[in-house]
Amino acid sequence: MAKYEILYIIRPNIEEEAKNALVARFDSILTDNGATVVESKDWEKRRLAYEIQDFREGLYHIVNVEANDDAALKEFDRLSKINADILRHMIVKLDA
């Protein structure tokens, strides 16, 4: 199984309840497509290096994932690009 780390930035003005639902939804997207979520945690609210969609800050969230193939990651990537609450995301394959 390959190990991946996903970091995504959530818009800072989202309500706590909506943020928790968003995180749960994207964790379930990964598990529904065959990946195993090892860890999913909020990092912190941080200042961005440059403005993204008129926001100067963002809520960072980190997810560690194990997957046999990249189907779950492709689906995560596709859906996070069209979700207005996620400002940016990055998927990195970790060395074994």
UniProtKB/Swiss-Prot annotation:
Keywords: Ribonucleoprotein, Ribosomal protein, RNA-binding, rRNA-binding. CDD domains: bS6 (cd00473). SUPFAM superfamilies: Ribosomal protein S6 (SSF54995). The keyword Ribosomal protein applies. It comes from the Bacteria. GO terms for molecular function: small ribosomal subunit rRNA binding; structural constituent of ribosome. GO terms for biological process: translation. Signal peptide: none annotated. InterPro entries: Ribosomal_bS6, Ribosomal_bS6_sf, Ribosomal_S6_plastid/chlpt, Transl_elong_EF1B/ribsomal_bS6. GO terms for cellular component: cytoplasm; ribonucleoprotein complex; ribosome. Belongs to the bacterial ribosomal protein bS6 family. Binds together with bS18 to 16S ribosomal RNA. NCBIfam families: S6 (TIGR00166). This is Small ribosomal subunit protein bS6. The lineage of its organism: Bacteria, Bacillati, Bacillota, Bacilli, Lactobacillales. The gene is rpsF.
